Amino acid sequence: MSDFTHFNEQGRAKMVDVGEKPISQRTAVAAGRVLVNEKTFALIQSGGMKKGDVLTVAQIAGVMGAKRTPDIIPMCHPILMDGINLDLSLDETRKSVEIRATVTCDGRTGVEMEALSAVSIAALTVYDMCKAVQKDMTITDIRLVSKTGGVHGDYFREEN
């Protein structure tokens, strides 16, 4: 078990000590989508959803989700984030809400989980705001697109 940094001597989960790691500039980008039907798409597009402006509320929820990541994922460190940006757009061809989150910080650990949380919470918010109209929406393709900084180097996902 000693090769795994997330386990203590008894084999139980622990939060990794990052105190000795150097501070570096870090960025993570995550993305995902919510597939909807034509009626739901039209209501989102026109601003006609009874709960309000779906894209704006989901954007705010995504920012809040990134900030709350260590509260819902046990081994995530609380991180002082420098920036959280969510872009939500409508894809007419797919009939989807496209979600992209970028999170930045100067820190000892990365912000991948914060970016993924932002996308996930934004997607769940889209679902919540539209569920009265459509129950069979699909939240899909949540993924890490890229990350920079840290001792493990940069990562860029091959995207189509």
Regions found by a protein language model. Give the residues of each.
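C-terminal binding/interaction regions
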Residues: M1-L55, I60-H77, G83-N160
